[in-house]
Amino acid sequence: MAPSTAMLIMGLLKLPRLRLATHFLPCGRLTFVQCSTMNSRPLRTLLASPDPSLPKTLTSTRLTLFAAPYVLEPTSPATCVPWPFWSPNPSLVKSIPWMTLSSNSGWSAKIPVSMI
């Protein structure tokens, strides 16, 4: 027999216990029904605290290199680039303040959009 099996038979080693994740679903106005769901990896706990020599139940982890992006500037600095060509005629489309529609969100319709 393996040492762990012998320890189980003698009662020195306790088996880990599985716990079901439970949650309550509302079924009526004031009543709740307890529903048990089994996760793909249920919680495992020992009945007694394990000796330091015994392996504990740990969550599986995975090392992922370069998971977070490098630290970069949030925006590029503002630069003024002149347009090389001038329009000979004035623009036909003009914004008239009294013709703007009122907004539903509470913000004024006359606030310009940021160009950053």
UniProtKB/Swiss-Prot annotation:
Tell me what organism the protein belongs to.
Saccharomyces cerevisiae (strain ATCC 204508 / S288c) (Baker's yeast)
Which keywords does UniProt give here? Answer: Signal
Q: Which segment of the chain is annotated as a signal peptide?
A: 1-21
Q: What is this protein called?
A: Putative uncharacterized protein YCR045W-A
Other comment: Completely overlaps RRT12.
